[in-house]
């Protein structure tokens, strides 16, 4: 998210055939229509409000609003929380084109609300949050980070894990008997983000859609190199140091 440099802030197209990857809402309106049925059920039991976190191109928001209109269950407000100014502009353009008569129901937030009732929606958000790369070694648990080598190129570097990361890694390593040499990811950011809603959501539900595994499969010994993956122009690879800032870097959800 670094201004002008970060993947989500540099202005290049991310989604669709001209971008790096395709999400379900970009492929068909059926995804939004299906999600709308569940959103309607939740709103009828809580409040007619929606917050979508990380709304991408705005395609899902537009499809949801149109389907909820058809179901006669429009939200009083559809809020979008997105850190990228570039994506905010694209979301406004998408909704204005697809559902101009519903644009006045949409607002953009700069931070999480203190309290909220309704539906919190996030499609492929958690796998885009920062994750720590962890290595279990013979002599301890290490946090893998980035350094610059003698040639001036980015390379992996390790330092002993500490604090909350070490505690989480120790618990996982013990629970699943991870052998030395096992490497994987732990997203403290995803854990913290999810926990925040336990304090802020007074009535409603979180609807989180993403790629991932149950924890016992995420840390299975057949997945000893982790799940970190990069996407560039619809090609997947595992080198986060290639074309820095131009690749979508993701890790599956635990």
Predicted regions located by residue number:
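Class I S-adenosyl-L-methionine
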Residues: 107, 113-254
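Rossmann-like AdoMet
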Residues: 1-53, 57-116, 134
